Regions:
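A short mid-domain helix/strand-loop element embedded in enzyme catalytic domains
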Residues: 11, 131-135
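Helical element adjacent to the flavin cofactor pocket in flavoenzyme catalytic cores
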Residues: 136-162
Length: 162
């Protein structure tokens, strides 16, 4: 929701940046928790996301940085995510064909880190085997960069658009 981010552009286009009350979430706005009591946080910028996860998985620093860089690269491949109207670059077909699971599994053998990186799949009901990496990238990027909530509830968006 910060200026220059995809959601800000969309909400501004629909006139929602002035009429809906927004609140930025805390820096570590979400957490992935496991039955064993371990908790891992998602932070609200890619640099903080990396820093937070590297603190939890120091031996996986390269994998975490690679994940972050790949997400950001994938998002730039899809110009509509930033309301830039240009041709989609189909030359990087690997991006279109690769599943999110295959991408994440290729980064690390650490099962817990794999689960943490895939944790946002619930946001879009992503099926591990079927969800394309680019869908995971677009959702994860929006989630990490636009950690805001509607102060008076999400229904105000529907009311404003009606």
């Amino acid at each position: 929701m910060d200026e220059g981010q995809a959601l800000h552009s969309y909400f501004k286009y629909f006139g929602l940046t002035e009429t809906v009350k927004w609140k930025k979430m805390d820096a570590e706005f979400d957490q992935i928790s496991f039955d064993d009591g371990s908790v891992f946080h998602h932070a609200s910028s890619w640099s903080e996301f990396e820093k937070t996860l590297i603190a939890d998985f120091p031996e996986e620093a390269d994998a975490i940085r690679s994940y972050s860089a790949a997400i950001q690269k994938a998002v730039k491949t899809f110009p509509l995510d930033e309301l830039k109207f240009s041709e989609l670059d189909h030359t990087d077909s690997e991006l279109l064909d690769l599943s999110a699971k295959a991408f994440i599994d290729g980064l690390t053998q650490n099962e817990k880190l794999r689960a943490v990186l895939a944790g946002s799949n619930l946001l879009y009901a992503g099926s591990a085997e079927k969800c394309p990496f680019y869908v995971h990238a677009l959702v994860s990027n929006g989630y990490v960069l636009s950690a805001y909530k509607c102060l008076d509830g999400g229904s105000q968006i529907a009311k404003e658009l009606a």
